Every structure is written in C-alpha cells, then in structure tokens.
C-alpha cells in the first residue's frame, strides 16, 4: 500500500484582508443559508419564509431558484462533486484502485468539513423519514458514480450501479464517524474510511459475480430489494445513504 501523505486541515477560503467578499449569486446565497439553518434545526422544520430571510432574498427569488428543499440539497451535492472532480491529483494515477478511491473520498470529506453540523442534521432527518432517506439515496448513488469515475474505476452499466450503491452505503457509514471527528486532520475518519473500503471489497466481489453471470438480475435486484449480504453491510455501516 502506498504511503499516504499527511492531509492539511480543511478550511473555507477567506477573502483578502481589507477587501469585501464578492457578492454571491442568489442561488448560492440560498444554498449557504439553507445549510446554516440545517445546523440549527431539522430539514423538515425549515420554512420557506425563514430560508428567504436568512438568505436575504425575496420569496419570489427563492421560488425562482428552487421549487422545494430537496433540490437545494441536490445543488449542494453537485457543488461538492465539482469541487472534488476539479481537485484531482495526477500523482495518484499509478496507484491501485483502492488507493485512488481513498484519495478521492478523503478530498470529498475535506470539502464537506465546514458543514458537519448540517450533515449531522440531515442524517438524523433521514433516519426519521424513510421517504427522505430514499430520496437521499438516489442523490448519493449518482454522486458516487462520479467519485468512482474520478478514481478511474468503471461506473458504467449494471456493475457501475452496484458499485455506486455499495459505495454510497459505505460512505454513509464513514460519515457517522466524520461528523463527530474533532481532529483537524480527520484521523478517525481516515481510519474509518480505510476499514470501510476493506470490508466493502468482499461485498463488491459478491455482487460483481452476480453482474458477470446475470447482468439483468443484477440491476433488478437493486430495484426489488437488497440481498442478505447487502443487509449485513447496512447493519455494519448505517441505515441509509446520505448524498455527500
């Protein structure tokens, strides 16, 4: 296994001293305000009027940008995806797939670090509301297909669906450690991710065998329900996938 370099503590970018920060577009103001509110209250308790007031926009502007609260989460996730995809490390190209994926997911966690409180809030809401958890899972799978691609791991076809769903569940388990990891270097989170990827290799191999010999059944099983191995993984790593 290649030696992993020490990772710098994640930080929000700061404007130059003495210079006013650039004005955010209305859409970005709303996303930022929504995640600030999530740090204070549950997803289901946030009202449109409170959100518009926190963002400093009118209700008409809020409605123009977003039709409901879930698309705000989706927009945030897309922004995180883009940040991770833009930060690729060419030096990782020759590393094994597991190491490349570890690097990609750690970059994702570093990008998420300023919003730990909001993510913790969303995780709690997903546990209380199965329909919300299901919606989050759809976002998570889409996002993790991009993360697999960033790690140069095939994410196309039925096998890609399997990999993305498995990775979404694995990452949800890691997030449970991440939201309570107070170390700036995310040492506990790195260890949790390392263990999760090790455990996930067995599960991934079992389902990839299914895809190899019966690709139609592979895709349909993801729609109809989980196999016993998937339920075991859920029990070990978390009840739901969170789209981060």
Task: Walk through the language-model features, giving the residues of each.
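Short, hydrophobic secondary-structure boundary micro-motifs
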Residues: 47, 120-122, 135, 156
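Amphipathic alpha-helical interaction segments
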Residues: 29, 50, 103, 121, ...
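Short, basic, alpha-helical segments at the C-terminal edge of helix-turn-helix-like DNA-binding modules
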Residues: 77-84
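Amphipathic alpha-helical packing segments from all-alpha helical-bundle domains
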Residues: 130-153, 161-175, 191, 199
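Helix-turn-helix
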Residues: 2, 29, 37-75
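Short, Lys/Arg-enriched anionic-surface-contact patches
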Residues: 17-30
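Hydrophobic alpha-helical connector segments
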Residues: 75, 89-124, 128, 138
């Amino acid at each position: 296994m290649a030696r992993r370099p020490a990772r710098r503590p994640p930080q929000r970018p700061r404007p130059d001293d003495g210079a006013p920060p650039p004005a955010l577009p209305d859409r970005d103001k709303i996303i930022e305000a929504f995640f600030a509110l999530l740090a204070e209250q549950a997803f289901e308790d946030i009202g449109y009027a409170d959100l518009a007031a926190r963002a400093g926009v009118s209700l008409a502007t809020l409605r123009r940008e977003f039709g409901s609260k879930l698309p705000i989460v989706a927009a945030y996730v897309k922004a995180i995806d883009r940040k991770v995809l833009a930060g690729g490390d060419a030096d990782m190209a020759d590393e094994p797939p597991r190491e490349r994926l570890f690097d990609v997911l750690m970059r994702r966690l570093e990008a998420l670090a300023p919003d730990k409180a909001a993510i913790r809030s969303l995780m709690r809401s997903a546990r209380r509301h199965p329909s919300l958890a299901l919606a989050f899972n759809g976002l998570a799978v889409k996002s993790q297909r991009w993360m697999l691609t960033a790690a140069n791991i095939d994410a196309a076809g039925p096998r890609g669906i399997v990999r993305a769903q498995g990775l979404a569940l694995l990452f949800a388990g890691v997030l449970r450690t991440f939201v309570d990891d107070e170390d700036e270097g995310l040492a506990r989170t790195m260890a949790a991710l390392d263990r999760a990827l090790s455990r996930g290799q067995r599960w991934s191999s079992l389902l990839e065998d299914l895809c190899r010999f019966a690709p139609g059944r592979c895709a349909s099983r993801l729609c109809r329900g989980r196999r016993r191995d998937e339920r075991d993984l859920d029990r070990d790593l978390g009840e739901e996938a969170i789209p981060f």
